[in-house]
Amino acid sequence: MRITQGTFSFLPDLTDAQITSQLEYCLNQGWAVGIEYTDDPHPRNTYWEMFGLPMFDLRDAAGILLEINNARSTFPNHYIRVTAFDSTHTVESVVMSFIVNRPADEPGFRLVRQEEPGRTIRYSIESYAVQARPEGSRY
């Protein structure tokens, strides 16, 4: 199951040239770029681990791509995403994110149904990747 989170998630994986184009766009907008990774892609897991520090002062897309490749070699079986942060007053938020690396096997999610009092059914989803495997060894 292919995880669809962030910008471009329904498109085929981006090439390095396409990633560089997106990085240049982010830098031209004045956004700070960061790299994050995780092995738990649950949709509500919005707090991924930072790979290094956010690149507030970096203005070269090639340098950011070098850091992306370092993250790929360090965490080849994790999801890696690029985030672009807009520090403009009244925005001050991530305005763009896209996945630049994913594991070869994406196990997907299972739907959990739980009966509650009054014939109420509560639904939740769990990642197959986190079942019976600790963080860091899920892929």
From Swiss-Prot:
HAMAP family: RuBisCO_S_bact. GO terms for molecular function: ribulose-bisphosphate carboxylase activity. Belongs to the RuBisCO small chain family. Coiled coil: none annotated. SMART domains: RuBisCO_small (SM00961). Keywords: Calvin cycle, Carbon dioxide fixation, Plasmid. Disulfide bonds: none annotated. This is Ribulose bisphosphate carboxylase small subunit, plasmid. PANTHER family: RIBULOSE BISPHOSPHATE CARBOXYLASE SMALL CHAIN 1, CHLOROPLASTIC, RIBULOSE BISPHOSPHATE CARBOXYLASE SMALL SUBUNIT. The keyword Nucleus does not apply. It comes from Cupriavidus necator (strain ATCC 17699 / DSM 428 / KCTC 22496 / NCIMB 10442 / H16 / Stanier 337). RuBisCO catalyzes two reactions: the carboxylation of D-ribulose 1,5-bisphosphate, the primary event in carbon dioxide fixation, as well as the oxidative fragmentation of the pentose substrate. Both reactions occur simultaneously and in competition at the same active site. Although the small subunit is not catalytic it is essential for maximal activity. The keyword RNA-binding does not apply. The basic functional RuBisCO is composed of a large chain homodimer in a 'head-to-tail' conformation. In form I RuBisCO this homodimer is arranged in a barrel-like tetramer with the small subunits forming a tetrameric 'cap' on each end of the 'barrel'. GO terms for biological process: reductive pentose-phosphate cycle. Heterohexadecamer of 8 large and 8 small subunits.
